[in-house]
Amino acid sequence: MASITLTPSEKDIQAFLEHYQTSLAPSKNPYIRYFLKLPQATVSIYTSGKILLQGEGAEKYASFFGYQAVEQTSGQNLPLIGTDEVGNGSYFGGLAVVAAFVTPDQHDFLRKLGVGDSKTLTDQKIRQITPILKEKIQHQALLLSPSKYNEVIGDRYNAVSVKVALHNQAIYLLLQKGVQPEKIVIDAFTSAKNYDKYLAQEANRFSNPISLEEKAEGKYLSVAVSSVIARDLFLENLENLGRELGYQLPSGAGTASDKVASQILQAYGMQGLSFCAKLHFKNTEKAKKRLER
């Protein structure tokens, strides 16, 4: 199902509503000003000014605002910002988010370097090529440490909204550097509807439309670059945290994490665990139970 997010002017929004007023429908979402049920598409107009179009006819109605669809096969042939995050599924370590700006003339260089989805590259290869990428590619990297992560989760953010905030901030800061992308792609970690809902609470905003696409790291080199740099940043953070505590911290959230967590808990208490791990994971309770044996 096609999903398009736009930020048109209020004048264009009102013109759209007038044109399709017979399709207005009620919505229980407090963040939605207007909701329209159209043939082959739904349109949600949010209080933030964003518009979300979903359905097979999304592109048709988006054209009302001047939107022009880009064929998937030619998507690479545009100057793009792509974002990705690493660390979301790991108990230990922070959450790394990177936005990278890649132009078509950089594609050959990136392919020769071996850039692809970081999930298909060895950690050794990632550590090897990341310094080159950081030097050659305009990017913005953000790292939310475990201690800061634990501070904001359950207070202002949840596991999804904190990623929305980081992706948005990385893109915002990269745009501030003067790059001019024709498209912005986020490796989808939630629905466009959820993304826009959580985006409403963020202060830093930009007018460029974004596209959330599943497995985008395999479609766009800009997302692949972000994936690689983010993986390197996460691994570096994992090593540094482990070095400070005197433990080798495993990536992931399996039984190895439970074992190390129980050792850290015994040695340093919850304060030590909060320093290096995301406490809302189930591993925390499993580590406590290990100490009770």
UniProtKB/Swiss-Prot annotation:
Top class in the EC scheme: hydrolase
EC number assigned by the record: 3.1.26.4
UniProt GO molecular function: magnesium ion binding; RNA binding; RNA-DNA hybrid ribonuclease activity
Binding residues annotated for a divalent metal cation, in chain numbering: 84-85, 187
InterPro entries assigned: RNase_HII/HIII (IPR001352), RNase_HII/HIII_dom (IPR024567), RNase_HIII (IPR004641), RNase_HIII_N (IPR024568), RNaseH-like_sf (IPR012337), RNaseH_sf (IPR036397), TBP_dom_sf (IPR012295)
GO cellular component, one term: ribonuclease H2 complex
Catalytic activity: Endonucleolytic cleavage to 5'-phosphomonoester
Cofactor(s) essential for the protein: Mn(2+); Mg(2+)
The keyword Metal-binding is assigned to this record: yes
Domain RNase H type-2 intervals: 78-293
Family per similarity comment: Belongs to the RNase HII family. RnhC subfamily.
Function: Endonuclease that specifically degrades the RNA of RNA-DNA hybrids.
Protein name (record): Ribonuclease HIII
Species lineage: Bacteria, Bacillati, Bacillota, Bacilli, Lactobacillales
Gene name of this polypeptide: rnhC
